[in-house]
């Protein structure tokens, strides 16, 4: 069943001020392959530092990076290739078998169209040894669709972590893989389709309905189903049943990535980037089945929007916005941040990347140098800057 949550649409016509600034310092984590496509984060060795995994789409590699700590974070990071698969679009950490060794799941598009697990070695000393990793496919996903994104999530409250998956055409879908009693038996993972899609960009778990159960918030980029969508979890006892589909808005845009956070000012709960270069802010209205949608045009001299995040860049207590871009050709910037002035119709543009790089991806916000402000981690895949981070100059 689909429930339509009609958005009240407001368009804020504004132009962020353009200021000539130096870009932030860029540090390379890895540029050893081709087509780095998204960074996902977890502390896999329990040292308190965030580690990363990335799929290199053109290079056909899935790699893991162990954080060397703030003193060495500006150098190349210790890394391991955990598997070689064609066209990996996404890679994410998940301890699927619960043995304490954090595995990696890769989602592949192209002609591969399969989801793989890369089993981590149980001995922590072997984590950076590529020959100690084992790669295997989930049979239920083989040659089904172009898999784009994976969200590890305990959907049904049993047998550990399940996998929520999203794809693009052909056969675009969102669904979940149910973990069996022995997660190592990949043939026993069961597929449950939830939603017919066009092109899935984001999958995020968030309790948007307030019932204590994480739902799945997604952006669907293409086709008649495009927009911002909530799949309402029916409860762990009914997880294999029907999930209500709530359409929150954005159908008139090619929506890209999203971020969710309750922000006192300007009052948005969800922010979404769009290919047509608008940031969409969503807030709950007085009516329970209506959301207010606000559109903010992109800053000048940037590519087309890809990922967006809330971040207090300058530590003034107000949440700013940062976004990455594709198609940042020539003198266009691929990363900029918009300073909050306290007025939601007035955002001030600031530089992050400068003109170097063309196609950037998912943004992760972490204090890698431990100086008290948030740095920005991302990938760039056209000029092969690779897996990189930008050092926040605030401190």
Question: Which sequence ranges carry the predicted segments?
Answer:
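Bacterial N-terminal signal peptides
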Residues: 6-17
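N-terminal secretory signal peptides that target proteins for export/translocation
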Residues: 1-2
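Beta-propeller-forming repeat regions
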Residues: 20-395
């Amino acid at each position: 069943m689909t429930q339509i949550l009609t958005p009240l649409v407001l368009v804020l016509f504004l132009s962020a001020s353009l200021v000539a600034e130096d870009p932030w310092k860029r540090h390379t984590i890895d540029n050893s392959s081709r087509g780095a496509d998204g960074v996902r984060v977890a502390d896999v060795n329990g040292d308190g530092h965030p580690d990363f995994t990335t799929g290199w789409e053109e290079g056909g590699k899935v790699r893991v990076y162990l954080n060397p700590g703030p003193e060495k974070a500006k150098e190349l990071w210790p890394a391991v290739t955990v598997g070689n698969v064609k066209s990996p679009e996404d890679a994410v950490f998940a301890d699927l078998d619960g043995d304490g060794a954090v595995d990696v799941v890769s989602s592949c598009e192209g002609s591969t169209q399969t989801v793989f697990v890369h089993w981590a070695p149980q001995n922590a000393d072997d984590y950076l040894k590529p020959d100690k990793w084992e790669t295997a496919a989930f049979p239920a996903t083989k040659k089904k669709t172009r898999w784009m994104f994976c969200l590890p999530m305990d959907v049904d409250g049993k047998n550990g972590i399940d996998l929520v998956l999203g794809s693009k055409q052909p056969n675009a879908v969102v669904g979940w893989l149910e973990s069996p009693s022995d997660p190592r038996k990949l043939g026993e993972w069961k597929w449950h389709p939830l939603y017919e899609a066009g092109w899935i960009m984001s999958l995020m778990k968030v309790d948007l309905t307030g019932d204590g159960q994480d739902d799945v918030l997604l952006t669907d980029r293409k086709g008649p189903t495009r927009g911002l969508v909530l799949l309402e979890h029916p409860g762990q006892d009914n997880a294999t049943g029907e999930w209500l589909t709530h359409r929150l808005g954005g159908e008139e845009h090619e929506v890209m990535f999203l971020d969710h956070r309750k922000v006192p000012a300007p009052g948005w709960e969800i922010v979404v980037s769009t290919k047509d270069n608008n940031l969409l802010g969503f807030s709950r209205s007085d009516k329970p089945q209506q959301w207010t949608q606000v559109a903010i045009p992109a800053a000048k001299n940037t590519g087309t929007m890809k990922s967006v995040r809330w971040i207090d860049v300058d530590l003034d207590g107000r949440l700013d916005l940062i976004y990455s871009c594709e198609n940042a050709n020539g003198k266009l910037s691929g990363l900029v941040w918009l300073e909050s002035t306290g007025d939601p119709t007035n955002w001030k543009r600031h530089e992050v990347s400068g003109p170097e790089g063309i196609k950037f991806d998912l943004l992760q916000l972490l204090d890698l140098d431990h100086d008290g402000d948030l740095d920005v981690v991302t990938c760039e895949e056209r000029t092969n800057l690779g897996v990189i981070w930008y050092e926040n100059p605030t401190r």
